[in-house]
Every structure is written in C-alpha cells, then in structure tokens.
C-alpha cells in the first residue's frame, strides 16, 4: 500500500471533481500505467469503470515523506487514446 498525504490543492480537486478515496487507492496500488514525468513527479493512471472508463491521473511528489499527491484529475487526453 502506497502511503501518501494530499496537498491542499489535491483535497480541493478531490471534492470538486468527485474523486473517491477508493479510486485513489486503486490507482496508486494497481495502476494501469506508472511513469516518472519530466517534472520529476510520479504519474499514476487507471481507468475507473464507475466513471465510464474515464482515466484517473494522479501526480505524486515522491521526493518528500510522506509522499504527497500534488494533483489528480480525469485525463480526457488519455481516455481518447483507449
């Protein structure tokens, strides 16, 4: 299980975008894809069936402890590529 905290921005986006904590856990623990971005952060993506297969994209700073989710959103660009 990935340990993390949410930034203030991520908490706000979670509420605004109606992203459940279960979806966050599933994305971090069993991502469809995981990569280090050019920004140095880890990017996790996962298709969420409850959102008609929308792709949840989580950006996490792994250089701090505990790891911090910087932002999270449903990535329309990735959903189109499916």
Name these PLM-found stretches.
Residues 1-82:
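Ribonuclease/tRNase effector modules and their secretory precursors
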């Amino acid at each position: 299980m990935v340990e993390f905290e949410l930034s203030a921005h991520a908490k706000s986006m979670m509420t605004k975008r109606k992203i459940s904590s279960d979806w966050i856990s599933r994305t971090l623990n069993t991502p469809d894809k995981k990569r280090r971005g050019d920004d140095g952060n880890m990017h996790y993506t996962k298709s969420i069936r409850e959102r008609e297969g929308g792709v949840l994209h989580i950006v996490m700073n792994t250089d701090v402890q505990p790891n911090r989710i910087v932002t999270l959103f449903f990535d329309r660009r990735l959903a189109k590529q499916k």
